[in-house]
Amino acid sequence: MLRGDIVKKDSIVRISFAYLFRIKVGNKYLLVKNERNTGKYQPVGGVYKFTENEKMELKNKFHVIDDDRIPIDKSSKDDYRLQLENRYLKKFIKRFDKKANRESIDNLSREFIEELIDKEIVNWNQINYRVCGRHITNLEFSQHFQIYEILLADIVELLPTKDQEIDLKKLAENSSDLYKFADAYEINSLGVDPKNKKLQESIATHTKKILQENEGNLCKLPEQGKCYRVNIIDSNVE
């Protein structure tokens, strides 16, 4: 919170539940370009999706309202990104983990497909990943969105096969506007490099959440340490 402000029970809070992939090759992380024209690179991943029934349930229980801080369109209309009164916040988060009708951590292939498979960056039919934990921000006032917000991001680590490792190394050797590889220093500095006169941020702030050295700071999940294998279904194939 800012300036000693107190968040009241009826204060409106913006909340977002997301998942992010740590995809590491050597000492560098694979990042993809943000699709909302920020020009910045970020981890593969995005906001969890819920079903229409789930949204109705949330309206009935917690009186949630749509989050309009990011334009609601075809790609974002079912995002688990909402606003609600602070009085419901704890129960809302608890419900997300236990009862929510949504994408689950045992199959996080949707964003992987949209950001890597559909764009032909990689051509894989299966992925394996390990659950690392959850990053949770403090409840703070967002200067960007002018609202109190709390952001949750489940972090998973890709466990590539030998063939997939080869593919990733080949990607790292080639340049593309769709993706980039960045080490921890670049990510922590958000891509700013004064020595080379790169003074504009090119990496999104939330990218730091996937760094290997930050894993010990993540909150524990019931699934923490579990590994999942998910078959990939190409959305371009009917």
Q: What is each model feature region?
A:
Residues 1-238:
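N-terminal leader/linker segments that precede catalytic domains of diphosphate-processing enzymes
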